[in-house]
Amino acid sequence: LHAQEGAECVLYALALGDVRPPPALRRGRRAALVDQVSALGTRLRLPLLDLALATLRQAPPERRPVILKQLRTLTARRRDQDLLCWALTAIAERHLGAPHRALPRPDIHRLAAVANDIQVVFSALAWAGDSARGTALSGFQRATHGLLPAGRLLLAPERCTPNRLDPAIARLARLTPLLKAPLID
């Protein structure tokens, strides 16, 4: 993880999850590294991602877009259905991509205007925290208490796809700072 090639390989292996890697990652040292990452299971994905990104942030600026392009190519089919794949890709893009543009102007002044978006994001977080329905429901209810109108329920996992998360997060970014605070807390 301290060498750029190893860090790239770990990043790609994490994003692929249990999908068979492409030929370039099935040979030599890369294949061994992919196998090691797969054997570690899911609990170490985020710590491994942190270590890999720390190394990749030191990569030459002209190499970073290449890494991101390869990552997007590897994850293109899965990113829209697999929440973890989407999250890993988004984290890598944030750390390795070009500096972010300014935040959108806060023009949403009521939580009710973004209730659907809150429901999508917090449902995804609840399912990511625990796949057992009872635990996910309990977590969702605790997190959204006072944020959502009565009657808003935990969405099924298939309704919390990255296709719905991206626009929901973009709309929540437009909330005024005072309304963002309870969402973050």
Segments predicted by a language model, with ranges:
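Small-residue-enriched hydrophobic alpha-helices in membranes
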Residues: 1-76, 83-185
